[in-house]
Amino acid sequence: MEVFVPFDATDPKTRLSDLLDADERSAVARAMLRDVLDALAETPHQPRVLATEDVDCSAPVTVDDRPLTPAVNDALAAVDGPAAVVMADLALVTPDALGRLFEPDAGVVLAPGLGGGTNALLARRPAFRVDYHGFSYRDHVEAATAVGGDVVTVDSFRLAVDVDAPDDLVEVLLHTDGRTAATLHSLGVELAPTESRGAVTRRS
């Protein structure tokens, strides 16, 4: 089964701008992509990166600079059989977490993000199409039902945490020791406990 990994190689992770400059954000984004590809390499499935420009990585790359939704939908339409989509910013993902996505025998399997988005999915219904936006999980449930697919939702912390904002980096530093965590450490990003909850800061 082919697994598409969308990746913004042009101007990634702009919500980290208060903490990281453009080159640093690019380095973190590429580290996350490689963490995701490392996890996928331990599954039986073949990843393909859908990138806005060419990127050096361990998987084949298809360059498509269109917005996320049309790029993914055209990729899904070109596949004869089941296909999955796993976002490139799931820095906490593990082979076991991916196994929970790939295992259910359902028409559509969805892994929602913490804010209501869709962080990963598996589609066995050829007519299923995506529509990515803030609350896309809810709409993807409806879209799967509309094409006659039974839907399974995967409740997984490691699939639910995607890295967009500085607070998300807390989870990376707490729960992983992969390429992303190493890159953050090299940039001087570290945990900064507060009275209410953890945060991150940069060493001066």
Which stretches of residues belong to each language-model region?
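N-terminal nucleotide-binding beta1-loop-alpha1 segment
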Residues: M1-L16
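The conserved acidic donor/metal-binding loop of glycosyltransferases
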Residues: M87-A91
